Structures are given as structure tokens and as C-alpha cells.
């Protein structure tokens, strides 16, 4: 009986798992509820998310991964074991091969054959970090990571709304604003959204109308940092591989890649065609799940 491969994208906000032959088998928040009295974990993933904001003082919400970095190894280990057990299921006859996210896996998930001697540039904008890498022959040639990504976008929106409209909003509302009217480029017909929150001065409920142009301004510093990171990687790329990238284009993935106009902004700065892949949020897990197969061909 063949051994299955499972790829895991352990993200700042969400963790996903892909199993060969089954597809995406897990998509849960990277969050844990910890009981301080018993010193045990009460809930993980979606169950923990549902408890957020409703826990008692003897419990604590823990996000063990921040800005793409593991900040609590003990909790992360337990969370990872839980996710793996969920992904495997109870009917597994053999232990699967587990792969954790690697840059090559991102490109594989986007449908690119990284085993060929061609340069591929992938940009993964997650929740905590944005990772940029040039891949060739299933290996990383040059790469960079910047702690500016989806969560940074949300914080920028929170700050802008508080400063310019005197309104306190939560992270969930900032996420909704980003999805509904967020943009990285100027729009000929700006979109609008009614936003409710709490007046900074009076503490009473307040409603304001935001425009997509305001959100573009709020996100400008963050989007510019990502774009300049991509530009910097292109400058460090060997000429032969750079020529391949010009021909093949830039692959954009991750939840942050879904920000309207992000691909266009990168394309304008680099002069290289940029494509946001389908299923941008799950492509990392999908590709990582297939990565072991690719490496097995090389080893064999």
C-alpha cells in the first residue's frame, strides 16, 4: 500500500493541510485556548476560535505563530500534532510522509514544474510574512522575507480609521474592510463602505463611510515594502534566471495576494507580468503536499 503525502502550511492566521489523493483536508485557525489552572490546552483551531472573546479569566488565548515566526514552541508542537491527526484521520494504515511549507512547494502548488532548469519567481503574501523566492531545479536560488503582510494591512486600516475618523474598530472589521474595499492601486470609480465602531472621544457607537481610495492610502507603506522586496530580489537574480522570469512571469499567492490590484502594483514596479494563482490561500499546502514526490524523483 503506497504511503500518502501530507503538506502543511503552518500559518500565522490559519493552518492548512493537503493530502495526495484527497485534496485539502484541513483549514483551521492557528489558535489555542489554554487553561491556566490545569495547565492544559482546552481547544485548538476552529473550536478555539469560537471561544475567542467568550473565555473566563482562568483561560488564555494563545497564537503561537506571529509574523511567520514560532513564538511558543511547546504550544506549536501540540497544535501541529493535533492538525496532523485531523489530516490523517482514524483510518490511516501507514504513517504518511509529512512536509512543512517550503518555497518550492508554493511554486509546485501553482502548477509550475520546478524540476526544470528555469527560473521561477514566487511571491507568497501570508498573514504574518511576505516571502519572495527564485526557484530553479527544485531549489531556492535567492530569497527574502519581510514581516509585512495581511496582518500588517489590517493594523494599517485600524490605525487609519482611528486617526482620520476618530473611530475604534476591531480586527474582524478591519479584515472585512480590506476584503470589501481594499486596494493597492488607484481606482477610477472608488468603492465605498459603511463602517460601524466606537467613537474615540465619547465611547458611543458611531458610523462612518470609507472609500477604497482611503484604504489605498492607508496600505501604501505596507504594499510598497512588499513591492520593493520583490524588486530587490529581481536585482539579485542571475541574468539567465532573470530572463526566464521575464518570459514566465511572477507567481503571486497567499491570502494577501487577494488584495485588489496587488498584482498590478508589482507588475508596474518590476515591468514583469504578474499572475495571482487560483486558490491563492490553499496553494501553499497543496504544493507542499506534492513536494515530497518531487524530491523523491531527485533522490531516486
What is the predicted function of each stretch?
Residues 1-127, 133-251, 257-300:
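Nucleotide/phosphate-binding catalytic cleft detector across ATP-hydrolyzing
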